[in-house]
């Protein structure tokens, strides 16, 4: 623990991670949270990180969307997707169970926290889904299944309306053009919670912020002093800001030498080292 008053002296990267308490029914699945974390770090490695633009990724969202696709795969395709997602069980039923546990855990976030998970699949009306595929999507992911005519311009509005509703209006337009047949899969995760230690509005003040370009910007910056989990790694500092109930936290990384160097450092870090 450290008494920390944090000022922006470099490029600040904000990462929201969920501290999940998943207890799968199958003993071989007990490392699933670690494998999901590894998927997130592996995904971060492969992104083209910009030093000048903000970006946001949700490994859990991508895991759900690819998990839905994996549910309908078979043979070498299913094996390759399973390795990517950290689904290494020879039992399809056990793998579906751990994905169900992940969704159920996220849907039970605790008091004072809003966390909604929504999955949907739009299928072109020229295609008939396999019955078992439809059943698994509904049972494992609670997927909304809808048969539509992809070439119909109204399909864009229907999908965008679903996205807007699932994200509480935060994302109102996902598609500009009709999706490519035969299927369009989507996941949305909506999170809202108060800080465990609230920031005081009157404490927000103009402070210097130094982006990777070397410029000196003045921005409105929240601030407070208190005891928070803190660590210093190779090439970065990190502080955890817990949300109410202490089950979720925002981890704020301050890189020593820019975002790309931070990503390189995180390649050598496991999430258990930070949490």
Task: Please report, for each region that a protein language model flagged, where it lies by residue.
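Short non-domain terminal segments
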Residues: 18-20, 30, 207, 246, ...
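Short amphipathic alpha-helical leader/targeting segments
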Residues: 79-81, 199, 228, 264
């Amino acid at each position: 623990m450290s008494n920390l008053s944090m000022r922006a002296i470099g490029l600040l990267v904000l990462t929201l991670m969920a501290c999940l308490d998943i207890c799968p029914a199958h003993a071989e699945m007990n490392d699933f949270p670690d494998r999901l974390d590894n998927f997130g770090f592996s995904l971060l490695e492969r992104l083209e990180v910009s030093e000048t633009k903000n970006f946001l990724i949700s490994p859990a969202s991508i895991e759900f969307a690819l998990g839905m696709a994996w549910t309908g795969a078979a043979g070498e395709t299913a094996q390759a997707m399973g390795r990517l997602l950290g689904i290494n069980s020879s039992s399809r039923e056990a793998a579906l169970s751990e994905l169900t546990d992940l969704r159920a855990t996220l849907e039970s976030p605790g008091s004072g926290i809003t966390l909604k998970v929504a999955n949907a699949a739009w299928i072109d009306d020229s295609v008939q889904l396999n019955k078992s595929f439809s059943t698994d999507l509904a049972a494992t992911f609670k997927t909304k299944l809808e048969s539509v005519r992809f070439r119909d311009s109204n399909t864009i509005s229907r999908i965008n309306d679903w996205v807007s509703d699932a994200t509480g209006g935060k994302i109102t337009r996902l598609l500009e053009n009709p999706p490519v047949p035969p299927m369009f899969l989507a996941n949305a995760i909506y999170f809202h919670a108060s800080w465990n230690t609230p920031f005081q509005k009157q404490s927000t003040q103009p402070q210097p912020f130094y982006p990777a370009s070397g410029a000196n910007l003045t921005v409105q910056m929240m601030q407070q002093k208190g005891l928070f989990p803190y660590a210093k790694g190779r090439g970065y500092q990190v502080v955890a800001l817990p949300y109410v109930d202490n089950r979720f936290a925002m981890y704020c990384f301050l890189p020593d030498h820019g975002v790309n160097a931070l990503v390189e450092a995180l390649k050598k870090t496991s999430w258990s080292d930070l949490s």
